[in-house]
From Swiss-Prot:
Name of the protein in its database record: Indole-3-glycerol phosphate synthase
GO BP terms, alphabetized: L-tryptophan biosynthetic process
A single MF term (Gene Ontology): phosphoribosylanthranilate isomerase activity
Pathway: Amino-acid biosynthesis; L-tryptophan biosynthesis; L-tryptophan from chorismate: step 4/5
Organism taxonomic ancestry: Bacteria, Bacillati, Cyanobacteriota, Cyanophyceae, Synechococcales
PROSITE patterns, sorted: IGPS (PS00614)
Keywords of the record: Amino-acid biosynthesis, Aromatic amino acid biosynthesis, Decarboxylase, Lyase, Tryptophan biosynthesis
CDD domains in the record: IGPS
Length: 294
């Protein structure tokens, strides 16, 4: 799958990254491409407001990141749970009206989450880096910045806001993109969850050295349809390669019950990322405890 890019200002493009550019009168072909085009505009605007050098200064003053991977490995609950702080999504609209990131994060920590994921996209998920900052202030758990990362600048944004790990989505990045972003992330001490949805993307992910986390997204980001069989199908074919890679496998999206967790764990998942199933409940701590214990 090719995701076309539409950078609003060619001067901010990284010269060695290659991607298709649509004509000015073309519309995005699906929601994922729309998100990517908007993200290119958003990043260009952010660079104007906050220069990279300022972010670098902020990052230099921070303590070392927490070890996201170690927290998942150390979990006595299997599969380990990455609980997500998410207000809305493009497919479901607002998921939680009474959105209090600090209270939600504390509840997740008390409920047994190994790590947290925080949505930072504004337009489509109603999140923000300020939400990540809020969560960082109230919990000690490792945090994943859940974002559509296209530029190294966003890695500095994530680190400055308190992230310990970042999401890279194979569907929206070339191999050159991924290699370069992995290098920058490592220089910042950020661990990377490299997300795939199909066999071609998983084969690409397995080709990168040192990837510690591979996520299988059960949601097709072009349609937002979800199917847990995605994890089962890919692990049935690539299970041995995944084990040999040494990467932890995270199953993402469409997980609503203990049976769902058992299903993907049986397929080989070491951890799960759960958001909507928890965010729709009035008592998220109880919901998480129930999800974990069954």
């Amino acid at each position: 799958m090719e995701i076309r890019r539409r950078p609003p200002n060619p001067k901010v493009r990284v010269a060695h990254l290659e991607y298709a550019v649509p004509h000015d009168d073309e519309a995005p072909r699906h929601i994922l491409e729309e998100i990517v085009w908007e993200k290119d505009r958003e990043v260009a605007q952010a660079r104007e407001r906050v220069p990279l050098e300022k972010l670098k200064s902020q990052v230099a003053a921070l303590p070392a990141p927490r070890d996201f991977v170690a927290a998942l490995k150390a979990s006595c609950r299997k599969p380990a749970v990455i609980a997500e702080v998410k207000k809305a999504s493009p497919s479901k609209g607002v998921i939680r009206e009474d959105f209090d990131p600090e209270a939600i994060a504390k509840a997740y920590a008390e409920g047994g989450a190994s790590c947290l994921s925080v949505l930072t996209d504004k337009r489509f998920f109603q999140g923000g880096f300020e939400v990540l900052v809020q969560v960082r202030q109230v919990v000690d758990l490792p945090l994943l910045c859940k974002e559509f990362i296209l530029s190294p600048y966003q890695l500095y944004q994530a680190r400055a806001a308190g992230a310990d790990a970042v999401l890279l989505i194979a569907a929206i990045l070339t191999d050159q993109d991924i290699s370069y972003l992995l290098k920058v992330a490592r220089s910042l001490g950020l661990q990377v969850l490299l997300e795939v949805h199909d066999a071609a993307e998983l084969e690409r992910a397995l080709g990168f050295e040192g990837v510690q986390l591979i996520g299988i997204n059960n949601r097709d980001l072009t349609s937002f349809d979800t199917d847990l069989a995605t994890t089962e199908t890919l692990t049935a074919t690539y299970g041995e390669q995944l084990r040999q890679s040494g990467a932890l496998l995270v199953s993402e999206s469409g997980l609503f019950s203990r049976d769902d967790l058992d299903r993907v764990q049986s397929a080989g998942a070491d951890a799960v990322l759960v958001g909507e199933a928890l965010m729709r409940q009035s008592d998220v701590q109880q919901a998480l405890e129930t999800l974990i214990s069954g």
